[in-house]
């Protein structure tokens, strides 16, 4: 029974290839550009009436992930206000943290 099913699909596929218009593509079909009667006559020759503007990229640029900060901004907090966000580590604190880790490993 499965053999008859596969045989019947063969002729259908060949008919679709002959027509050329009936293709079963995946996803959304491409939008066909509107054909105006004036351009249909010229057809083979395109005249660039004006230079098309390139599309602007959206979102984050590709190479920006690994770059460091271009400007380092000094954070100055007003007296009496708490700084927002995670507190920044100072070099002294980093060294203390490293020495604490090594002392824990020794124990």
Curated annotation (Swiss-Prot):
Record PTM Phosphoserine, positions in chain: 9, 36, 44, 49, 99, 102-103
Skewed-composition ranges (Basic residues): 55-74
Protein name, UniProt field: High mobility group protein HMG-I/HMG-Y
Keywords: Acetylation, ADP-ribosylation, Chromosome, DNA-binding, Isopeptide bond, Methylation, Nucleus, Phosphoprotein, Repeat, Transcription, Transcription regulation, Ubl conjugation
Modified how: Isoforms HMG-I and HMG-Y can be phosphorylated by HIPK2. Phosphorylation may modulate DNA-binding affinity. Methylation at Arg-58 is mutually exclusive with methylation at Arg-60.
GO BP terms in the entry: autophagy; B cell differentiation; cell population proliferation; chromatin organization; erythrocyte differentiation; gene expression; glucose homeostasis; heart development
Annotated function: HMG-I/Y bind preferentially to the minor groove of A+T rich regions in double-stranded DNA. It is suggested that these proteins could function in nucleosome phasing and in the 3'-end processing of mRNA transcripts. They are also involved in the transcription regulation of genes containing, or in close proximity to A+T-rich regions.
Residues in cross-link Glycyl lysine isopeptide (Lys-Gly) (interchain with G-Cter in SUMO2): 15
Superkingdom assignment: Eukaryota
Region span, Interaction with HIPK2: 53-77
Modified residues (Omega-N-methylarginine): 26, 58, 60
Positions of modified residues (ADP-ribosylserine): 8-9
Record note on quaternary structure: Interacts with HIPK2.
SMART domains in the record: AT_hook
Localization, UniProt: Nucleus; Chromosome
Record-stated family: Belongs to the HMGA family.
Keyword Nucleus attributed: yes
Annotated Acidic residues bias: 93-107
GO molecular function: chromatin binding; D-loop DNA binding; DNA binding; minor groove of adenine-thymine-rich DNA binding; nuclear retinoic acid receptor binding; nuclear retinoid X receptor binding; peroxisome proliferator activated receptor binding; RNA polymerase II cis-regulatory region sequence-specific DNA binding
Region (Disordered): 1-107
Cellular compartments per GO CC: cytoplasm; male germ cell nucleus; mitochondrion; nucleus; RNA polymerase II transcription regulator complex; senescence-associated heterochromatin focus; SUMO ligase complex
